[in-house]
Amino acid sequence: MLRHNFRSSIFIRIVANSWSITRSVSSAPIKAESRKQQDSLKNIDSGEAYTALGNIRQKKDVFHYTDRASGTGYSHYSNSVYQHRPYIWPPLRKMYNWNYAFVIAGMVILMSDFEWIKEQIKGASTPFRPEASQKEESTDSGTEIEVKEKPKKKKLGFRERRIIEYEDRLRLYSTPDKIFRYFATLKIIDPNDESGRIFEVFMTPEDFLRSFTPGVMQPRRWGLDSFKAYNPEKHKRHKFSDPNSIFYKLGENGLINFSDYLFLMTLLSTSHADFALAFKIFDVDGNGALDKEEFTKVQQLIMSQTTVGQRHRDHVTPNSSFRVETNSALETYFFGKDGKGSLSSEKFIEFQERLQHDILKMEFERRDAMENSDGLITEESFAQLLLLHAQIAEKKQKHMLKRVKRRFKGDQSKGVSFDETKAFFEFLYHIDDVDIALHFHKMAGMSIDAKLLKRVAVKVTGIPLSDHVVDVVITLFDDNLDGKLSHEEMVAVMRRRMRRGLERPRDTGLFRLFDAVLECGKRAYHASPLPFY
């Protein structure tokens, strides 16, 4: 009994001691944490000691950045939050820095001029080509072989295409003074002006042709109000046109000022019959000739009827170089330096025909010449010359030219001379009479083939056409390849070609729409019997 009591007392003492030890050990951290919180709250305002949910606000370290625990990567850490985040293969993550290399390489490729690099490589590899060894062998043997290589056309880049599109819109919709300021390249400074700010702007014949020819880009050095200073006394030998050309007779070395530019554009867009009628109207004396004053009235009348003259804004032109002058080179050529001469209608129409001839010659010389032949252009180039101002969709135009190229290739290609081109364009000057004749033949049930077209040309205009040129024209406008000519489209295209696109309205059509709506409203107002309130 005593032994049992002794054992129980020892057990009770052991349990009590362990409880006291456990209690002291477990309560020590709690007391330390509570003392720490009390010390931290001494310097905190009572309003900021607790959060919105009633919890004690913990003091943050000044350099605390994130609560994220350190791990193997962002994808591993976020998988517990975003369950559907794609898995990235660890070796692929190590290649992340290669992205910078790919971006830099792409930028270098986009900024590289591959045409220049290609030319450099081609120039460096020329001595190592087989052609070079053949040339060396031919020179060693003493034989002189002249090989004319056809220069390849340089493909237009993105920048050039955008510039050409802008310049084509400029030709269509801008005022004549802006077109002149953009395409003119020369200026002659007034010798009496020491500052050099007073000058007159001139066009060369090439500038004049470029100002209304679509698809031809202005040289990069020149643009709007950008001109090269030209001194006629220092450059007396420099001629910008052939002495036999009509441009050479207009002024200094064949240069064109703004007044002459306006009237030359009017000449290109007006037929011979209109000028002959205007001469008869203003010939008060009835002697068949006009003096300077009467010619000025004819000039103003014709210009007011053309789109070029209607768009001219003489009253708002800032520079005197772009105003119509009463004493221009044209008037000096027609009436002499004193202005007392007279101009007959025959002389004026002859001047107009020579102008058409010189411009056609410059357009012909711009075409692609045939290989190993002088003075001939390819049939495709002749077709391009006919479609120059056709206003046909680009896709259809390419299809028409492709048809001509397939028809005249290899031995079938004979080339077209300037005399043949000139004869066909003289035939086109009577396009209205040709249209009537072809229409009558069609009403009679006759198909328009090459034989009929040549006969109409001789009977109506008195101009014989070569068989080869007629074959090219029929191939160009023969859509169904039956050897017959669809003359309606040909006549419409040739009319626009002879006017060189100068008869088109010089606006986008929006203002004409507003004018039409206003005119219809006025007519409805005056014609309505009901009062408008």
From Swiss-Prot:
Q: How are the domains described in the entry?
A: The EF-hand domains have high affinity for calcium and act as sensors of calcium levels.
GO MF terms here are: calcium ion binding
Report which gene this protein is encoded by: micu-1
Identify this protein by name.
Answer: Calcium uptake protein 1 homolog, mitochondrial
In the database record, which residues form the transit peptide? 1-13
Q: Which organism is it from?
A: Caenorhabditis briggsae
Domain EF-hand: from-to ranges: 270-305, 337-358, 465-500
Segment Disordered: which positions? 127-147
Pfam families from the entry? EF-hand_5, EF-hand_8
Q: Which residues bind Ca(2+)?
A: 283, 285, 287, 294
Q: What does this protein do?
A: Calcium sensor of the mitochondrial calcium uniporter (mcu-1) channel, which senses calcium level via its EF-hand domains. At low calcium levels, micu-1 occludes the pore of the mcu-1 channel, preventing mitochondrial calcium uptake. At higher calcium levels, calcium-binding to micu-1 induces a conformational change that weakens mcu-1-micu-1 interactions and moves micu-1 away from the pore, allowing calcium permeation through the mcu-1 channel. Also required to protect against manganese toxicity by preventing manganese uptake by mcu-1.
Looking up CDD domains in the UniProt record yields: EFh_MICU
Q: Which UniProt keywords apply?
A: Calcium, Calcium transport, Ion transport, Membrane, Metal-binding, Mitochondrion, Mitochondrion inner membrane, Repeat, Transit peptide, Transport
- Please, one GO biological process term? mitochondrial calcium ion homeostasis
